[in-house]
Amino acid sequence: MKNKKKMCFGVIIGTRAYFNSELAKDVRKQLLETLTKEGYDYVILSEDATPTGSSSIETREDGLKCAKLFRENRERIDGIIVSLPNFGFEIGIINAISVADLNVPVLVQACDDENDKVDLDSRRDAFCGKISVCNNLYQYGIPFTDTTLHTYSIYSDLLAADINKFAAICRVVNGLRHARIGAIGTRPAGFQTVRASEKLLQASGITVIPVDLSEILAAAHKIEDTDEVLQAKLKEIRQYAVVPEQYSDKLVLQAKFGVAGGKRVEANE
């Protein structure tokens, strides 16, 4: 993903019919407002899509509706945010994520109880619900990201901070998933710290394209000093580095190497 668009999250509001549905409506409203304020798009079920209302997911049937919506927006969704206004019901949530099979990062957020609001209309019990949801994700082999605190108010400043951090995680994960990395030359014998397994990288979707150093050097030496791309590279380097005049010839060599390497990248994208 090359910052191609405004980031978009699939949003799941988990609930359980035993709890007051108004809690879920409030969380939905505040979460979507925060996403919009922070500059993100979102995909979420309509408020009347499930029996519990407020886009909330409880049963497997609810989860399948959400999974269908997420699959239809596969190309848009960069990550999934699960919010628990109350204990929630793990079955609906895990089916939504597993059946959608988007293979994107997942953030799990839960709301905490207020000490003076633990009656039937106000109790949340999302602390335990989050443990259940995360345990299911673990069982299904679905990686997930936790919030700064296990639970907090949906009105907390931590919400925006956690969403922005999660967005960065999504950019890295999705950006590397199909990355192609050029490996120029062999590893120096004295630097075992930079050893890496191409097979392990490939298992994560990262492909390594090796090239002999002599090929890049040969291509660099063929570049004329008057080459327009070379002159642009020299200008670029001088904009961020101060190079003494006596080293100007070395700078030209460095720039040629950069141009040759850049052309190799373009040829193997």
Report the location of each language-model feature.
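Metallocofactor- and cofactor-centric catalytic cores in central/energy metabolism, strongly enriched
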Residues: 1-174, 178-268
